[in-house]
């Protein structure tokens, strides 16, 4: 008799994806972030569900309902802070996951990569809308500033913004629809993530060397299940350290002031994980130019497979490209720092230089390094 996990229609799918899946024997801890993102998503859906049971999406009561969750609901404070800081952990894992893909050439799996970019954009949209829900000062003004960017689109811009707002300013209608979208999007993300996994399992995982691992595969269970469990424990440890010892470390104090349309905060800025893109947006004096640069800073990921010039897939044996990759990481950290600073000298200049450097590295320097390395191979 065949094993039930191999014969049962449902168990068979799980078995082929998580148990008997042939995996490369040499994938490092950088390959843990996929499963960690899955854990983050489940955690966010669960904590979010419990928050939604007590939250009200009305401008008059939204702020009070969040306060009520923290003060009066049993363990409401821990659920709220796990959800808020869980978003930060989600983005740390996301950026690590994308960075791993860039470094080891995983973007040559085109379908998997492009669906990954769609996932990134969807998660960013979800996080942005979630930040609006507590209806604090930064929630309100963040929503106003970011949605207003669409007014830079010629001809239809103003109508588009008013359509998204559901009126002539960010108000009751905006908050209600943002809550509706914030609730539904994680489930859509789950569905897209399944497609992401489906395409990955068509080709099998990449590995640090970037060469085919068909000759040396091991079963996913128990080797990588135990490795993923360790990763998950470390993730939860990091999250709980943040939640229990410094819950407001990554938040903005302005969001503890209820939203007031008549009083603009001195420095409007998004959550830390959007600061790099915000810095690129601010570094261009023209509104439409800034919006285009902002969009392109993320959408540039779609072009990465086209910009691959090297004969080698991974950067493991390419010191020049490695150097540029870590320069790009440093550049993104610089942009993140600049995004949180006021718009004044010298931050403006640093931001502009870092923005130019970002596009220059990806579009010019890294493809050039690939070509140079190909030439060096012939020496």
Curated annotation (Swiss-Prot):
Residues engaged in binding heme b b566: 97, 196
SUPFAM superfamilies: a domain/subunit of cytochrome bc1 complex (Ubiquinol-cytochrome c reductase) (SSF81648), Transmembrane di-heme cytochromes (SSF81342)
Keywords: Electron transport, Heme, Iron, Membrane, Metal-binding, Mitochondrion, Mitochondrion inner membrane, Respiratory chain, Transmembrane, Transmembrane helix, Transport, Ubiquinone
Superkingdom of the source species: Eukaryota
Binding site for heme b b562: 83, 182
Statement: the UniProt record of this protein carries the keyword Transport: yes
Membrane topology: Multi-pass membrane protein
TM regions (residue ranges): 33-53, 77-98, 113-133, 178-198, 226-246, 288-308, 320-340, 347-367
Protein name: Cytochrome b
Organism phylogeny: Eukaryota, Metazoa, Chordata, Craniata, Vertebrata
